[in-house]
């Protein structure tokens, strides 16, 4: 059981590695540090558009991703029916249903609602007490009162102002009385 000698065979098979100088070691360390510094994403890469989309659309300008959609936003029941592009294969019957779905009140219901409006009552009380309303409030009061007048005319309701007027006297009664204020 002979053991091989370690030192003699190992030295003969491998060439001797030259040790690096201090300057070489420092230069390699600087390069490694430089490589580590440049790892990761560049600054602002989250907000940048992908480069692959720019390559596909060659003529298209690079758009700012912060700008939102150009699709119109529906603001109400009628606006949403108008803003939607009409499909060519389907008839326009659903659009008519949307327009007809707008809740309409009878004139009596609308008049009742306007007469019981707490905002209108509060603003009219402020006007009666001598306060000056803002232009916005004043225009709203005027529009609401005009609408009430229109609804009352539609329904054939007359204002209750007739009670304040003096009853008309008969011409014969005036002549018989010989009232001095009626004489010219």
From Swiss-Prot:
User: Which stretches are transmembrane?
Assistant: none
- Give a yes or no for keyword rRNA-binding in this entry: no
Q: Which InterPro entries match?
A: YihI
The ranges of region (Disordered) come to: 1-107
Cite the GO molecular-function annotations of the record: GTPase activator activity
A GO BP term, please? ribosome biogenesis
Where composition is biased (Low complexity), the residues are 80-95
Asked if the keyword Nucleus belongs to this entry, the reply reads no
Q: What are the protein's UniProt keywords?
A: GTPase activation, Ribosome biogenesis
- Indicate, by first and last residue, each region the UniProt record lists as having compositional bias (Basic and acidic residues): 21-32
Q: What does this protein do?
A: A GTPase-activating protein (GAP) that modifies Der/EngA GTPase function. May play a role in ribosome biogenesis.
Q: Which NCBIfam families match?
A: PRK05244.1-1
Record note on quaternary structure? Interacts with Der.
The text of the family note is: Belongs to the YihI family.
This chain belongs to the protein called: Der GTPase-activating protein YihI
Source organism (scientific name): Pectobacterium carotovorum subsp. carotovorum (strain PC1)
The organism's lineage? Bacteria, Pseudomonadati, Pseudomonadota, Gammaproteobacteria, Enterobacterales
From the UniProt record, report the name of the gene that encodes this protein.
yihI
């Amino acid at each position: 059981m002979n053991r091989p000698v370690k030192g003699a065979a190992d030295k003969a098979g491998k060439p001797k590695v030259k040790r690096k100088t201090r300057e070489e070691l420092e230069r390699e360390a600087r390069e490694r540090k430089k490589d580590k510094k440049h790892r990761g994403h560049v600054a602002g890469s989250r907000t940048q558009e992908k480069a692959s989309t720019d390559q596909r659309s060659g003529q298209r300008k690079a758009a700012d991703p912060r700008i939102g959609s150009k699709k119109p936003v529906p603001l109400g029941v009628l606006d949403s029916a108008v803003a939607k592009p009409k499909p060519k294969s389907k008839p326009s019957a659903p659009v008519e249903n949307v327009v007809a779905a707008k809740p309409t009140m009878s004139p009596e219901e609308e008049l009742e609602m306007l007469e019981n409006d707490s905002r209108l009552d509060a603003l009219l009380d402020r006007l009666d007490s001598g306060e000056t309303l803002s232009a916005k409030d004043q225009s709203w009061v005027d529009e609401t009162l005009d609408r009430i007048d229109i609804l009352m005319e539609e329904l054939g309701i007359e204002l209750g102002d007739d009670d304040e007027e003096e009853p008309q006297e008969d011409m014969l009664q005036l002549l018989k009385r010989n009232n001095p204020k009626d004489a010219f």
